[in-house]
């Protein structure tokens, strides 16, 4: 084999060169390796490796997410290469000769034509030769491809917006792992749901200064960021940066936490889960899971203790003291400290944080469960001294303020004076079949003539229908009519499935075309079992055509008219389905703005019992990016903040749902006015005061009354959210817990 000889002036070689030494496979060279030289070399490399390990242990949290190559030190690789050479075949050898040359160690290496090199000392006295293994480049080529360096992932910590107690979650982020910013949002949503309650999907990421992050390239390694759900603004709080070592908050540990905090929910509306009214509810707990004991304990505590509730707070200070209210739920009350933080943000003490809380009788509140017991009025104190003899006594003005609040929360029945209130007039007409069904089946006229007759009755022509609708569906009877639209029942020619065709007349909504565009845009985004699906949309100059899912039972208004009132079990099914639909909408930042019985379609069994409810008619729906001020909706179901024109958001849908639940149980709305006059009706709505009059409510439990009272809060800040409806014990079906409410 051809060998190249390289002359050197010195035997001084650094560790990098010695690590690449290998004997020539040629049989002409003696197979001897000076043990002393090898021992010194290996000892030097081991010492260097140990030193590197000590440094890396101090900074271990920066190495958790590195690739296998990036986390290995150079001395380790040198040592591995040297040991690899030592374990080679017997033909591999290194011969080191003596030299009297200088310490410059200068040498030259020419191109390699063979796999080995021979180095001959410059000094004449050196008779031995030095055979060198392949260069470092050739050694790297022998390293398996799995050790090829990859792009280092960024190790980033994410907090929940506004939650100063949540320790955060740390995950590796790279362009290879997340091809888009939306993919990162999806992963963060999943990870946060495993540890805390969040109101919806992660939509925005901020840095710790509140700057919005718009791409993966803006993320920096080792930095912390804040995840915001829906349209939340950045909340500048002191995030819990020192609660847990960074190395412990890894993606692996978060994924092992299989004890989901929302397992007791009837369904997960964010994941389009079906919520059948007849199916048994899932049980809480169900296994230990792989999460930490702390998380499991916190989850168990929340499941057994925390439920949506409004409490009254008395702020410490000069009498008469300020009195305010706070909505507690699973999102702001996962722990005792979280509740104190929520109280602090509401009462705004001059001394800073709330440190001590007492009941109205002066008992100190020390556990999370104390906030969800029989007491609903609490004193909030900071670091100031407490005068137990005077501070826990209420003045007359304070008594009156608390009684006014309790009046809005009253669930006891009162005797109804006068005749029974009536349901309002239906806000849209429902036509009877234009053609008798039996006569229609037996008609001998051509199909197109029947269609033409139906359309002519509405002022339309058969040729106006889009060809893809006319050729795919057969036209049936008119099933509904609104201010701007008419609805037909249609049937697919091939499958025989029934659908609804909504024809919107653009001439009737001049200047309001944006409502049509918003309806179509919103419905294209939606996919939920309790929301009517959009099958097809066709836009023409004069009309907009929407092919929609058809529900056989008609709307809820007609069902109420037929049965007058529903049982609690039937009402529970409907409010679950409506609550799930609203939660799904609100998680996407969409408000319906026109929830009423006419826009709720029901599916009935052969006995007339409600099996399923679906939300329809998104003509007024819109995306909420800020407070809305447009006055719209139906008078009976409109929320106080709409009438006051102070700005409103998602919770107006909860108010409307509360009105509907009230109607389902007794057959009439809580706010009525003589002869349907709007001014007295609006005054009653703004006051927020209503009754549960006997005998219509005498057989209805306190649990559902409590739910209605929380949904019909005039102050939107303390009104239930759509998720709170689903979390309420009555909705879940825990009757025992419902009976413990005290107002």
UniProtKB/Swiss-Prot annotation:
Keywords: ATP-binding, Kinase, Nucleotide-binding, Phosphoprotein, Repeat, Serine/threonine-protein kinase, Transferase. SUPFAM superfamilies: Doublecortin (DC), Protein kinase-like (PK-like). Coiled coil: none annotated. ATP binds at residues 479-487, 502. It comes from Drosophila simulans (Fruit fly). This is Serine/threonine-protein kinase GD17699. It catalyses: L-seryl-[protein] + ATP = O-phospho-L-seryl-[protein] + ADP + H(+); L-threonyl-[protein] + ATP = O-phospho-L-threonyl-[protein] + ADP + H(+). Residues 54-78 are annotated as: Disordered. One of its GO terms (molecular function) is protein serine kinase activity. The active site is at 594 (proton acceptor). Disulfide bonds: none annotated. Residues 154-240, 309-392 form the Doublecortin domain. Belongs to the protein kinase superfamily. CAMK Ser/Thr protein kinase family. CaMK subfamily. It is an enzyme of class 2 (transferase). PANTHER family: SERINE/THREONINE-PROTEIN KINASE. GO terms for biological process: intracellular signal transduction. The keyword Ribosomal protein does not apply. The keyword Nucleus does not apply. Pfam families: DCX (PF03607), Pkinase (PF00069). Its EC number is 2.7.11.1. InterPro entries: Doublecortin_dom, Doublecortin_dom_sf, Kinase-like_dom_sf, Prot_kinase_dom, Protein_kinase_ATP_BS, Ser/Thr_kinase_AS. Residues 473-731 form the Protein kinase domain. PROSITE patterns: DC, PROTEIN_KINASE_ATP, PROTEIN_KINASE_DOM, PROTEIN_KINASE_ST.
């Amino acid at each position: 084999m051809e060998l190249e000889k390289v002359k050197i002036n010195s035997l001084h070689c650094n560790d990098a060169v010695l690590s690449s030494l290998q004997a020539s496979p040629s049989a002409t060279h003696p197979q001897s390796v000076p043990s002393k030289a090898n021992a010194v070399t290996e000892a030097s490399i081991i010492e260097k490796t140990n030193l590197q390990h000590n440094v890396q242990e101090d900074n271990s949290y920066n190495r958790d997410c590195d690739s296998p190559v990036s986390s290995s030190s150079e001395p380790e690789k040198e040592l591995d290469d040297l040991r690899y050479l030592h374990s080679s075949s017997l033909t591999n050898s290194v011969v080191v000769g003596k030299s009297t040359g200088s310490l410059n160690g200068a040498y030259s290496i020419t191109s390699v034509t063979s796999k080995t090199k021979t180095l001959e000392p410059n000094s004449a006295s050196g008779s031995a030769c030095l055979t060198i293994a392949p260069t470092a480049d050739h050694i790297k080529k022998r390293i398996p491809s799995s050790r090829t360096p990859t792009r280092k992932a960024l190790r980033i910590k994410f907090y929940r917006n506004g939650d100063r107690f949540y320790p955060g979650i740390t995950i590796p982020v790279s362009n290879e792992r997340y091809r888009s910013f939306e993919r990162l949002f999806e992963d963060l949503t999943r990870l946060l749901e495993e540890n805390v309650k969040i109101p919806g999907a992660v939509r925005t990421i901020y840095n710790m200064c509140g700057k919005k992050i718009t791409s993966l390239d803006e993320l920096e390694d080792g930095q912390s960021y804040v995840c915001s759900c829906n349209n939340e603004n950045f909340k500048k709080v002191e995030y819990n940066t020192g609660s847990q070592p960074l190395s412990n908050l890894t993606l692996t540990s978060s994924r092992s936490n299989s004890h989901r905090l929302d397992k007791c929910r009837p369904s997960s509306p964010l994941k389009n889960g079906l919520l059948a009214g007849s199916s048994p509810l899932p049980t809480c707990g169900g296994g230990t899971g792989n999460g930490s004991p702390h998380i499991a304990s916190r989850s168990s505590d929340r499941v057994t203790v925390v439920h949506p509730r409004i409490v009254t707070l008395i702020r410490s200070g000069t009498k008469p003291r300020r009195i305010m209210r706070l909505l507690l739920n699973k999102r702001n009350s996962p722990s005792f400290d979280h509740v104190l933080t929520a109280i602090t943000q509401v009462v705004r003490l001059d001394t800073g944080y709330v440190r001590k809380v007492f009941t109205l009788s002066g008992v100190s509140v020390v556990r999370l469960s104390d906030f969800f017991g029989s007491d609903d009025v609490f004193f909030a104190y900071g670091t100031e001294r407490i005068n137990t003899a005077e501070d826990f006594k209420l003045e007359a003005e304070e008594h009156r303020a608390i009684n006014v609040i309790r009046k809005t929360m009253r669930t006891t029945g009162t005797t109804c004076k006068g005749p029974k209130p009536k349901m309002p007039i239906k806000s849209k007409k429902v036509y009877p079949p234009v053609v008798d069904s039996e006569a229609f089946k037996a008609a001998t006229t051509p199909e197109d003539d029947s269609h033409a007759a139906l359309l002519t009755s509405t002022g339309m022509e058969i040729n106006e229908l889009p060809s893809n609708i006319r050729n795919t569906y057969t036209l049936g009877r008119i099933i509904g009519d609104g201010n701007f639209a008419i609805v037909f029942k249609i049937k697919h020619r091939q499958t025989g499935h029934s659908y609804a065709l909504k024809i919107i007349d653009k001439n009737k909504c001049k200047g309001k075309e944006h409502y049509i565009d918003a309806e179509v845009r919103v419905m294209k985004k939606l996919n939920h079992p309790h929301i009517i699906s959009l099958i097809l949309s066709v836009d023409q100059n004069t009309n907009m055509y929407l092919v929609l899912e058809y529900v056989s039972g008609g709307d809820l208004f007609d069902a109420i008219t037929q049965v007058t009132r529903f049982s609690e079990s039937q009402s529970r099914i409907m409010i679950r389905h409506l609550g799930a639909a609203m939660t799904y909408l609100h998680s996407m930042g969409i408000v319906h703005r026109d929830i009423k019985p006419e826009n709720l379609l029901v599916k009935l069994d052969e006995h007339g019992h409600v099996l399923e409810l679906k939300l329809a008619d998104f003509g007024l729906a819109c995306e909420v990016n800020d407070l809305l001020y447009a006055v719209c909706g139906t008078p009976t179901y409109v929320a106080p903040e709409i009438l006051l024109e102070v700005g409103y958001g998602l919770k107006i849908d909860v108010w409307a749902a509360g009105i509907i639940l009230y109607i389902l149980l007794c057959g009439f709305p809580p706010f009525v006015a003589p002869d349907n006059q709007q001014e007295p009706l609006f005054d009653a709505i703004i006051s927020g005061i209503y009754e549960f009059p006997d005998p219509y409510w005498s057989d209805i439990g306190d649990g559902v009354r409590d739910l209605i009272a929380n949904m019909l809060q005039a102050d939107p800040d303390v009104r239930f959210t759509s998720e709170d409806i689903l979390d309420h014990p009555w909705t879940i079906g825990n009757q025992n817990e419902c009976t413990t409410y005290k107002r």
